[in-house]
Amino acid sequence: MENQEKASIAGHMFDVVVIGGGISGLSAAKLLTEYGVSVLVLEARDRVGGRTYTIRNEHVDYVDVGGAYVGPTQNRILRLSKELGIETYKVNVSERLVQYVKGKTYPFRGAFPPVWNPIAYLDYNNLWRTIDNMGKEIPADAPWEAQHADEWDKMTMKELIDKICWTKTARRFAYLFVNINVTSEPHEVSALWFLWYVKQCGGTTRIFSVTNGGQERKFVGGSGQVSERIMDLLGDQVKLNHPVTHVDQSSNNIIIETLNHEHYECKYVINAIPPTLTAKIHFRPELPAERNQLIQRLPMGAIIKCMMYYKEAFWKKKDYCGCMIIEDEDAPISITLDDTKPDGSLPAIMGFILARKADRLAKLHKEIRKKKICELYAKVLGSQEALHPVHYEEKNWCEEQYSGGCYTAYFPPGIMTQYGRVIRQPVGRIFFAGTETATKWSGYMEGAVEAGERAAREVLNGLGKVTEKDIWVQEPESKDVPAVEITHTFWERNLPSVSGLLKIIGFSTSVTALGFVLYKYKLLPRS
């Protein structure tokens, strides 16, 4: 009662309070405002954007040190950014990509490095085909209801990879595939969750590709503009440096308290922060047991994003585009992309330090990390020019207390089937957004927009402004960034796995041997 009086006296009464000023929370606030709903966004940091963050200085002009990439089928973020007047440009892959393995550099073109060993090729082909086929069995909006959910959720992705792959070559690349896509280790994540994650991003080729894939484009001026421009539209409806500490929905209206002891009153709350950060908030009444258990069990991925700037794009002299896939345990960086500005200025290579390596290298001084990265690039690209950068930027997301890591939260084994179904379930008048709650491109900016707008429509339904059937809305395809259907050749669809080939050989050998015996003992007619 005392809190209610404080909130009312201060005049802080709103229809909805959104906790979290990232893309998801701000997408929700924008949609609610368009329906005439009074909204307040409370953001803990001194900036908006959440896990997107555009740094601006004289050395880089602008650089995305957080989420940056968009591509075909990510239609919501493309629609929103266009509405906000933000243009995209294509990440450069005009020249050759590079695979670095066992100390050697192998240039290639396409989404995946080529495999010349026929046995390894069968293994690779079967790996991607199996991951995609298993994903087809998993409902994007309810992975816990998949036919084999219990079996796959008890298994780590490492166990599944080891079960599928016969060759070290395929197994090693599969481990890297997990590192790159979810910034965690294969032994840490549930096979069910990872299979779902890849499926809801369009499959193995779509999630990993630059061209026609999740990394095709970036925003001119940086992805931070998405949140910044929504904040400009909302004006004083966004409050920075306001970490929420208490949410009390025990009375008619909900009372929100922030770290600086300000109080706000509202009818509904949208919680748009990573699930694990919800544990920083005191709820009254307490959260339901399943929700409380869930938020304690979803760790964040680990990543340090590194941008190395050079006087010129020296890699292009060798017909390299700047994309490197690096399979080397001692290498700090696992994958890179060209991060040069679309007009060709400020040549740069963006590299990810991922998962176990992020933890290991975070213990080193920044200058030592920089030196190790330059030495790696010099070795992989075969150029001493890599040793002489003009500037270096990095962002260790593991040290961000209001993110906890990046790109996204992951599900360890057993959690999806036991607690996953509550990820989007409202708690009283509290609704949940954030990219982790999305059903398409979860973990990306696209997922953040889907989740924010869905949570906003849930509130609008509660306010009587939209019907229940209008909560989930199909998004039309972007006309500016159309998707090309990903197809597979007859051989990709039908070539046997290594184990299948061995069975065929074994069967053929057995038939041949049987025929020889029958022939020898005159049990077969002679022509």
Curated annotation (Swiss-Prot):
It is found in: Mitochondrion outer membrane. It catalyses: a secondary aliphatic amine + O2 + H2O = a primary amine + an aldehyde + H2O2; a primary methyl amine + O2 + H2O = an aldehyde + H2O2 + NH4(+); (R)-adrenaline + O2 + H2O = (R)-3,4-dihydroxymandelaldehyde + methylamine + H2O2; dopamine + O2 + H2O = 3,4-dihydroxyphenylacetaldehyde + H2O2 + NH4(+). Keywords: Acetylation, Catecholamine metabolism, FAD, Flavoprotein, Membrane, Mitochondrion, Mitochondrion outer membrane, Neurotransmitter degradation, Oxidoreductase, Phosphoprotein, Transmembrane, Transmembrane helix. Residues 1-497 are cytoplasmic. Its cofactor is FAD. Its EC number is 1.4.3.21, 1.4.3.4. The chain crosses the membrane at residues 498-518. It is a single-pass type IV membrane protein. Pfam families: Amino_oxidase. The keyword Secreted does not apply. Its main location: mitochondrion. GO terms for cellular component: mitochondrial outer membrane. This is Amine oxidase [flavin-containing] A. It comes from Pongo abelii. The gene is MAOA.
